[in-house]
Amino acid sequence: PIGAMTRSNFINNPVGINSYQYASLVLYFSSLSGDKIVKEMRNVHYSTNTTLEKVVLEQLAAGPVNSKLSGVLTEEVRVLDVKVSEKTCTLNLNQAFLDTAAGTAAPEVVIYAMVNSLCDNLGVDKVQFQVEGTSDVVYGDSLSLAGPFHRNSDIIEIQEIQEQVTEAAESESQELGEPQIGL
């Protein structure tokens, strides 16, 4: 016989098997022209059993919410493994990643949408790509994946937020300042 169980017989772990976490993600998708990436913010709840790097990649695969943006990953692309070690994220994808490289976005756009999304959310400095465990591959017939990729700010399309704010202020002043006749 074991005897009566006391409080010290149990593990006090506030994070359980079916617990969820919340994250505000910075994701990058292709512009419709396919030559730049555009930032999209997304709030997600995800299982504590799933790593943040997998959540970021799943959200990239789900595509953008904004209809003025285009996705960078197809449904056929699978993440075989993803690891973070010493400020480097190593991402191993299946062969479909190379097979679907002939999309509308430039190869650099697809790669840096993934790199910038992973760097911004995970705090890593670089991303090393692998396809079926091999880094010595070429993406889109022109981009070697042999070396690690660092975050690239030059490829980000800066949206003119100031113009949107100015237009909103002008429309609001017209609504408030001009009495409309015939209502």
Protein language model annotation of sequence segments:
Residues 1-183:
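Bimodal "functional hotspot" detector
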